[in-house]
Amino acid sequence: MDEKLRLHEFMEIYYGLILFEIKLDKELRKQRISSSFATTFFVENKNLESLRGEIDAIDSQIVVLLNQRVQAAVEIGRIKSELGVDPYDPAREEQVFNKLEDLNKGPLHKESMRTIYREVISASIALEKNLVIGYLGPEATYTHQAAVNNFGSTLKYRPLPDIPDVFEAVECGECDYGVVPIENSTEGAVNRSLDLLVETELTIIAQVFLEVEHSLFSFCKVDEIDEVHSKDQALAQCGEWLRRNLPKARLVPITSTAEAVKNLEPGSTFGAIAGKMAGRIYDVPTQADAIQDRKNNVTRFLVVARNALPQRDGVRYRTSLVLSLSDKIGALKNALKSFSERGINLCKIESRPSRLKAWDYYFFIDFIGHRDEEGIGEVLKELEQTCTLVKFLGSYPEEPS
């Protein structure tokens, strides 16, 4: 009996030891995992702090170098001012952007590099001179966005009510430069801008391409909107989306996409179509993005100034002319022959009534090259002999800003 009791006690103790070992093993495993996690976290946190310290050190160098660059740019601006040279030079900027693209080995994309340096150059110009950029307003139009894309956010911008006002403000010196739309990939030419290029003495010094993405803004949900306001072109460019999503809504054309958003009020059942910039500036909720029917909707804008700029090496140029042809058979063919014989690439021909007499037209021609390049001067001389009007509108970088 005693032996059986001792055996039973032994078995209980032995079983308890086994359970204790199992429990101990689990606890040790848990401790090892915790220890491993703590070690990994400590190492990774140490690496993170080290990398942050490296970034801080790099930032310190960047700030010093940026200020050195700006100081050099300001000195250039002072010399330009003494020489009577314009502070803004899009061709020189294109040289800078091209050089940066060659230097950039990644991972930063070239578009990002261009955007960063666009702002660096803008800040430098702002310290050189208080430039004023006029544009077709109101604030937050696509023209405003194109102007900021071209000049950067640091300069002063002045919204103007109509395209003629932009030309007039630049002509009289109230604005240093003007930005106006010239054509859209779906709607065609902006005729008022074409007319004013002929009627005024301003010259084209740059072009800007802006991909137009329409958004729907409203203080109410899409299914509650009963009226949509926007510029007539924007309403047309979103026609299919509107018919599909707001078939009963009344479409109201007004003078500006930005104005449509600006006029929206909380509690109303109105919507407005405009670019994202308008929603940000006027603080109106976005109900739908990218509602345009065609995704390749691009508007081209021109930057106009009082003075033309000199040609620079390493920059691909586009030149714009306006011609008026004599009333003879084959007049247009003969004019275009001057370009083809010298291998000059025409990239645009646009006709527009001259408004001088019935059935008389101006021909707006764009071609690749600068007015001062070899061969192009000869073309211009030939055109002057065969055309009743040859007006140079500007040579400017072909690469869009």
Language model features: what each stretch is:
Residues 4, 30-33:
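Polybasic, lysine-rich low-complexity intrinsically disordered segments
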Residues 1, 21-27, 64:
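Coiled-coil-like amphipathic alpha-helices with heptad-repeat character
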Residues 9, 15-16, 32, 118, ...:
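Compositionally biased, intrinsically disordered low-complexity regions enriched in proline and serine
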Residues 2, 6-12, 16-17, 25:
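N-terminal amphipathic/hydrophobic targeting modules at extreme N-termini
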Residues 10, 14-15, 20, 37, ...:
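Aromatic (phenylalanine/tyrosine) cluster motif
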Residues 7, 29, 400-401:
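A short, highly charged, low-complexity intrinsically disordered segment
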Residues 24, 34-37:
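Short, often N-terminal, low-complexity regions
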Residues 37-401:
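Domain-level signature for soluble enzymes in the chorismate/prephenate branch of the shikimate pathway
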